[in-house]
Every structure is written in C-alpha cells, then in structure tokens.
C-alpha cells in the first residue's frame, strides 16, 4: 500500500517562541480550535519523532486523537489506495498554537499553512482544523509554563503565602504561574511576586498578588514557635530559619545570658530565645531586649510573645530607632552578652551607635556583636580574603576605629559566616566579633530628639508608602 506523503526526514521543523504556548484560557473547559495533521495511523510514531518541535506536548494530555465521528474529511487531498479507510486508519496529531490568538478558524489555518514546516504541498494538504474539548485539570496546570525560560523551580513559603521573584521573561505568564502554584499546593492561599527592592529600614518590599488573596498569616510555625504577621507590612524570610536556629542554639549554650536584638522584627530570634515552650528554657535563663522601629512589627512581636509564653521578665520589647536602642542599653547599664543586628542592607552602618561605648571597669565585659550584611560571592581563597577584608573595613568605618577588626581578628574573636545564597553574585553574611575596646575612645554619636523624630517620621512614611505598593489587581482581572 502506497501513500502519497513526503519523506518525513525531508520536512523542515519549526520551534515556536514562548508566546506560542497556550494562554491562561487553555485551562478553561472549552472547545478550542487546533491545527492538526491527518496521517496514517501506522506512521504516527514516525511523525511524532520527526515533527517533535511542533507537535502539541503537555503532560497528561494526548497529542494524538482518533478521528471524530460525523466529520467529513473528504476534502483532505491525500489519497488512499487499495481500499484504505481514512476514517479508521488515520489519527489527528495536534500542533502547538502559533501566533493566531483571536483569529477566526479560516485565518488560523491560513496563518499556520504559512509556517515553513507546512510548505510542502503534500504536507499542507494533510492540514485540517480540529475542535478538541480540553477541560481544566489542576494537576497539569503547573506544566503550562514549563517551556518559558527562567520559570522559578522553587519559591519561598511563609504560612499560606508563596513568594516568587519572577524574571522579566516570565512576567507575561505571571498570573498563569500563580494559578499553577496554588493548584499544585492546596495549603497555599495566595501567591505574591516581588516587584521592587527592599529600600526601607522596615525591610518590606513592594509586591503584587498573582493568585489568591489574604496576606495576614494566622499561624506560621518555625522551630516549635508560632508566629502571626502581615506579610505585606513586616519582614519575614522563611529561608533564614536555619540562621535563626543556629544563633539561638549558640546563644543558649551558657546557663544564663542577656541578649539585645536591635532589629527584632516579629521575633524570629527573640521569641525562641525566651519562649517557655523552648527545650532550653529550664536549662538556660535568657533575658532578651527586643526592639523594632516598625510599629506593625512591634505589635506582632508582642502578640507572638504572648502566643509562645514569653514572660515579661524574659522578653522586654521596644519600639525605637536601632541606634537609640543601642544607646539605651549602654546608658541603662544593661550588660548584654550578645547584640543581634539583622538588617542586612545597612546593619554595619548602625555600628556607629557603639562609638564612645562605656565598658564596665570592673568586669571589662565586651558583648559579642552579630551583624548581618550582603557582599559579593567568591570563587577562591584570594577573593574570599579580599571580601572578608572589605566587610570588616565597612564595620570598622562605622565603629570609627581603623584596624580594630582586620588587624585583631583573633583578639576580638572575629568570625565571618555565609548565611545563604541571595543571588548570582551576592551572599548574605553574618559577621560576629567582640566589641573592640578601641571604640571607647571614639567620640560618641549624638542623637538629638528632633533629628530622631524627623528620621523616624521619614521611615514610617516610607513604610506606609511601601505597603501601599501591594498591587490591587483584582482576582477577576488576574483570572481573566
């Protein structure tokens, strides 16, 4: 039996750009018009292999369908010899949608026939339109955008909120990606995308909602503690839970200690340090002075203290500027064993608040400072040494004493640790050291009430502006 078809190895192929992939409406149950080839059933595998770049491929979806009953295929010009029955022996192979959205059936077919893969007259004659009913199946939704470059393979989860950082290549598919994430993760209720950098001292970032709704987290669990927070108005990063646990474990080794958390947020360090539910509670007596400038974070810090049985004599909360808080600790002679400064964007600059520090003449007590910051990634020992020198010099500049860390690393117990990978060229670091005695001889930084009020007012306005930047695209618009 001979079929008048061109040799498949002579057919050109075509790879469609991301814009050729199914739009969000693909997931709505409806009859869609797809271009298709009418082929002999016995050559199905051969066709699929040769035209793999243009054949419709979607996990758990068929690319080959039987011919529909009641449809007249007599217009197809490919002849069958020897009594070959095209109604039984041929199948429809769906081809990916091209740039034909919004056009009628005739325009679609005309446009598709202009593709190089169909220029062979005998192939063009096999082309027909097929109405296939493809309904929504949540289980296959995440695969809709798998061919878009840079679709995130992972994302941060905070309670029922998924946080993604989409690249520009993926933005045309952002609502589709958001829906896919929700479909595959029933416990999630909302997906947000970061649309700007963290540029204020509250560490909040402008975001848009891609799918779902509800940024108020009723309950978020981390290392045995429960937290409430509003993801849009306070800072929370679930990827730092390892760092939270590490510092808590390190600080609670002695039988008793005092901690000053200058940028405490909603309490990821302060709460587990002082919670009566923590395993170390009856072994180590920890008193934590926890501060945050953001009034909303301060409110949730107090709420989380109650949730986790952090008693008032163990966890003392403040709503002050970071520098003012550090001055207060020294002025009131609170001999903290550790200062935590988790504000990576600018924490090293806050070290100027330690200038003119009054050490205890009797004990000579020097607190350990834990400063989080960002710096470049390194590829070898030479680059690492250069990076560490740069980070320490940045701290020295704020302390007002050159060489007090770089030249006295062993004396001041200097340690630099990579906390996590932030980006292709950036790491988050934790720099720990004992407060150098040299800072006592540096002129103290003066904080006037007027300047503090002005600075605090500016920061609060920045925070509210940032919160207002949460995109208000309606759920209806996202789903359309």
Swiss-Prot record:
Entry GO MF terms: tRNA (guanine(37)-N1)-methyltransferase activity; tRNA methyltransferase activity
Pfam families xref list: TRM5-TYW2_MTfase, TYW2_N_2
Subcellular location, record wording: Mitochondrion matrix; Nucleus; Cytoplasm
UniProt similarity note: Belongs to the class I-like SAM-binding methyltransferase superfamily. TRM5/TYW2 family.
One cellular component (GO) term of this entry: nucleus
Keywords: Cytoplasm, Methyltransferase, Mitochondrion, Nucleus, S-adenosyl-L-methionine, Transferase, tRNA processing
Classification via PROSITE patterns: SAM_MT_TRM5_TYW2 (PS51684)
Coiled coil: none
Record's protein name: tRNA (guanine(37)-N(1))-methyltransferase
Its EC number(s): 2.1.1.228
Functional description taken from the UniProt entry: Specifically methylates the N1 position of guanosine-37 in various cytoplasmic and mitochondrial tRNAs. Methylation is not dependent on the nature of the nucleoside 5' of the target nucleoside. This is the first step in the biosynthesis of wybutosine (yW), a modified base adjacent to the anticodon of tRNAs and required for accurate decoding.
Binding site for S-adenosyl-L-methionine: 244, 292-293, 321-322, 342
Catalysed conversion reaction: guanosine(37) in tRNA + S-adenosyl-L-methionine = N(1)-methylguanosine(37) in tRNA + S-adenosyl-L-homocysteine + H(+)
InterPro entries: MeTrfase_TRM5/TYW2, SAM-dependent_MTases_sf, TRM5-TYW2-like_MTfase, TRM5/TYW2-like_N, tRNA_Gua_MeTrfase_euk
Quaternary data: Monomer.
Main localization category: mitochondrion
BP GO terms, sorted: tRNA N1-guanine methylation
């Amino acid at each position: 039996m001979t079929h008048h078809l061109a040799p498949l190895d002579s057919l050109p192929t075509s790879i469609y750009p991301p814009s050729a992939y199914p739009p969000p409406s693909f997931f709505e149950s409806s009859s869609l018009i797809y271009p298709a080839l009418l082929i002999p059933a016995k050559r199905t595998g051969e066709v699929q292999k040769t035209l793999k770049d243009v054949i419709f491929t979607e996990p758990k979806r068929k690319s080959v369908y039987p011919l529909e009953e009641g449809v007249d295929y007599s217009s197809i010009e490919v002849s069958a010899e020897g009594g070959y029955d095209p109604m039984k022996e041929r199948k429809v192979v769906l081809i990916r949608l091209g740039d034909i959205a919004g056009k009628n059936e005739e325009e679609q077919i005309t446009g598709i026939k202009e593709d190089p893969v169909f220029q062979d007259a005998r192939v063009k004659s096999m082309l027909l339109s097929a109405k296939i009913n493809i309904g929504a199946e949540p289980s296959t939704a995440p695969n809709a955008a798998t061919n878009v470059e840079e679709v995130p393979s992972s994302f941060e989860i905070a309670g029922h909120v998924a946080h993604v950082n989409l690249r520009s290549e993926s933005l045309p598919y952002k609502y589709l990606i958001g829906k896919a994430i929700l479909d595959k993760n029933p416990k999630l209720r909302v997906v947000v995308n970061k649309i700007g950098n963290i540029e204020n001292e509250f560490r909040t970032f402008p975001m848009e909602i891609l799918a779902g709704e509800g940024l108020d987290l009723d309950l978020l669990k981390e290392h045995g503690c429960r937290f409430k927070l509003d993801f849009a108005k306070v800072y929370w990063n679930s990827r730092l839970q390892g760092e939270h646990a590490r510092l808590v474990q390190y600080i609670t080794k002695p039988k008793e200690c005092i901690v000053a958390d200058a940028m405490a947020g909603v309490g990821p360090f302060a709460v587990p340090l002082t919670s009566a539910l923590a395993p170390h509670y009856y072994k180590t007596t920890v008193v934590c002075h926890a501060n945050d400038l953001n009034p909303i974070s301060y409110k949730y810090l107090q709420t989380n203290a109650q949730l986790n049985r952090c008693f008032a004599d163990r966890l003392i909360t403040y709503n002050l500027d970071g520098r003012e808080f550090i001055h207060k600790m020294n002025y009131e002679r609170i001999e903290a064993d550790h200062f935590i400064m988790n504000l990576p964007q600018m924490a090293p600059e806050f070290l100027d608040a330690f200038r003119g520090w009054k050490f205890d003449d009797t004990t000579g007590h020097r607190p350990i400072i834990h400063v989080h910051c960002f710096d470049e990634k390194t590829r070898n020992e030479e680059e690492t040494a250069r990076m560490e020198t740069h980070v320490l010099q940045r701290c020295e500049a704020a302390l007002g004493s050159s060489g007090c860390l770089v030249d006295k690393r062993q004396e001041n117990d200097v340690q630099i640790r990579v906390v996590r990978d932030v980006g292709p060229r950036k790491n988050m670091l934790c720099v720990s050291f004992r407060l150098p005695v040299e800072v006592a001889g540096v002129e103290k930084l003066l904080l006037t009430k007027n300047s503090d009020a002005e600075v605090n007012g500016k920061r609060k306005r920045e925070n509210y502006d940032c919160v207002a930047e949460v995109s208000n695209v309606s759920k209806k618009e996202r789903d359309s």
